[in-house]
Amino acid sequence: MIKSARQLKDLIRNLSKNKSADAQILMRNYMMERFLERISLSEYRDKFILKGGMLVAAMVGLDARSTMDIDATVKGATVGIEEAENMIASIVSVPLDDGVEFRVKRISEIMDEAEYPGIRVSMETEFDGVVTPLKIDISTGDAITPREVRYSFKLMLEDRSIEIWAYNLETVLAEKLETVVSRATTNTRMRDFYDLHILSQLHGESIIPADLRAALIATARKRGTENYLADAPAAFDEIEADSNMEKLWRAYQKKFAYANDLSWHTVMESIRSLYGLTQ
């Protein structure tokens, strides 16, 4: 068990060198893991379903994807600000001998380009005097197809895993594919494009095409974008040919070293191949 900030910083410094990852991001990731373990031991362990960047990073490795927050959906419940407040209070009160304290700073409705309505919880953690900001986005009503899965989440600094519920691979891919198709050149989130590429490269053999097709249709139906799917090939051509999109990709490459060697064309070809599995 990590007992001091100095010990934690030393471990993270060494890991950042080995993984070529930013130490500040790794520190935040460690604190997100502390929250995730509390979820796994809480009364909400069967309602919280991990998705988003933290799940993708776990699937592909921290040296291939970084993330700054936790995305989750809550199953079988409507989550407003009051419900979220009660839920988070219960989770952070789970007793764990890790010395980490959580403080909720703000709870608000998500208004920024969200595919689903939800709640954003801004927190900070404190460990041996070190304060780290944390953000959790919680949604409800997501179309998980065919269903969520049990996921063994490997901890960053310990040789063990925690068992949580998570999106299945096909739903992770379907949500990002739908976003790429429906938003076309208005989607400035280059991580969607990168995630589709890296997941297809590292987990392509695990993809079940029928499940990916069903998940894509279910996601589009939920978001009211079914009519866009038939025009996906044209959308991909438009996206790849758009000079601003390629400029955004180059900026993403400069920011994240793990994307350095990936051409825009290579990424778009991966996305075309993924979409082809749904046909």
State the predicted function of each range.
Residues 1-48, 57-66, 70-279:
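Structured mid-to-C-terminal alpha-helical surface segments
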